[in-house]
Amino acid sequence: SFYYGVMWNKLYRAEVWKLLHYPEGRLHEDDFVAHRLFWRCDKVVCLPDVLYNYRLRSGSIMRTSLKPGAFDAVDGLADRYRFYVENGADRSVIDSAYAACWRRYLFLCAKVRQNPEPQLVKAISKEQFLMQGLISYLPNCRHMKMTEKLSAARWAMMPAESLCPAK
């Protein structure tokens, strides 16, 4: 099953990219595209060889402090969950995508709580609307523990300002 992946370390046939584009102005753009691309593939081959090297550079989204755009990843993962539901994916794939979306959201909320800057708290408030739209599936997800489900419900429903009080 595929519910997490990056695009940079793979080779593709050109035809699987037809009509697929990265969203403009969004961070974590792989989260919006990877599932759609792999859904189109008839066959995926994995090699044990190291053919790519990853370069760490200052200024990349992986090496900078938390910014409101980090919540784009949650939007992409929510899109992935909805895509799998709409296309009749296996229940395990749907549950994995759903859990990945909530876990990313909860991780970012915890990071904001450590450093509740106003623009980050505002980003949580904006994202809560999206997460509230996903909450109805929460009791059915088999890939989340009860403690995660309770935390998800709390972070989706309570005002961000009360969850992340200013220092």
Locations of regions flagged by a protein language model:
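A diffuse structural propensity rather than consistent per-protein peaks
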Residues: 13, 67, 143-145
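Structural motif
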Residues: 89-99, 147-150
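Membrane-interface aromatic/basic loop that binds lipid-linked glycans or pyrophosphate carriers
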Residues: 114-167
